[in-house]
Amino acid sequence: HSSNRRQRQMCIRDRDLSNSYVRLEVICDREGFWLKPHCDIEEKLMSSIVFVNLHNESENLGTDFYDAKLNKVKTVPYKHNYGYFFTSGPNTWHGMEKKEIKKERRCIQINYVTFETDWKVKS
């Protein structure tokens, strides 16, 4: 039944996104950028990034993920048109250690959030 399918689509990993808003950001980081390990605010229900690597930057420029003791456990490769998504929580540590950016590190970030933006998700 289509309403059941729609209802399932609005839930990701036990997160009800039906009353959320979509927030889209175009990001362009340059040399010197870094982002200390952090967990997202609780108002950010889901985060996703799509990498836009048009300048053949190093694959090492992807997002770093950490364990609870802030040991780096994975770097998502910074490949063109490649990305990830995750739901926020108390152990979703991520950031980016200071790395060499030759020209620029571009990304498109799409978040589902609880606060109002221009794009309401219809339930």
Q: Each PLM stretch: what is its role?
A:
Residues 15-25:
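A short coil-to-beta-strand element that immediately follows conserved catalytic motifs
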Residues 16-18, 37-41:
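Short, conserved, surface-exposed binding loops centered on an aromatic residue
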